[in-house]
């Protein structure tokens, strides 16, 4: 009886938590991690990892939508840049190198930062080369993104990628 009550309360709390999260535009990446085949506990399991502070911080910032990339930082510029115009401005990004029109440019969001920005191609290749999961290389990019942000065994690699990418950003200022 007690187990049933506990299970019911946990389910209710998870449902309320998810409902509240879905209302937040800032949690766009975090919300995208919840798919039908990924459990709630695997999404939050990275919080229990023993990682150095800076790695935990950067990983949490990315997942929670407060990593200082343009999708987030341009919320605070005046005048506010509309979210559909917060393009990636990294010097080696395709947006800059190819002189793309506005409708073809990539918005600098968490997905672009981790999966696509050519500024970080070398770092991304190094990270992918260290991933031991065979199934990772058979996934499409969306599935890879979710895998990278929900799998404990690669959390440290992803966090180190983020730290290294930000170090590279600072060297291009």
Residue ranges: model-predicted function:
Residues 7, 13-173:
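Family-specific functional microsites
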């Amino acid at each position: 009886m007690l187990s049933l009550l506990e299970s019911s309360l946990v389910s209710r709390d998870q449902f309320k938590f998810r409902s509240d999260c879905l209302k937040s535009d800032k949690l766009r990446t975090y919300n995208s991690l919840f798919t039908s085949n990924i459990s709630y506990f695997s999404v939050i399991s990275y919080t229990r990892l023993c990682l150095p502070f800076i790695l935990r911080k950067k990983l949490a910032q990315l997942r929670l939508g407060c990593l200082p990339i343009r999708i987030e930082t341009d919320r605070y510029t005046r005048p506010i840049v509309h979210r559909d115009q917060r393009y990636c401005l990294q010097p080696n990004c395709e947006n800059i190198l190819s002189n793309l029109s506005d409708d073809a440019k990539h918005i600098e969001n968490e997905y672009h930062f981790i999966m696509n920005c050519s500024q970080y191609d070398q770092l991304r290749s190094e990270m992918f080369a260290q991933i031991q999961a065979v199934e990772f290389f058979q996934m499409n990019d969306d599935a890879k993104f979710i895998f990278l942000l929900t799998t404990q065994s690669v959390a440290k690699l992803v966090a180190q990628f983020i730290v290294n990418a930000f170090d590279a950003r600072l060297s291009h200022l």
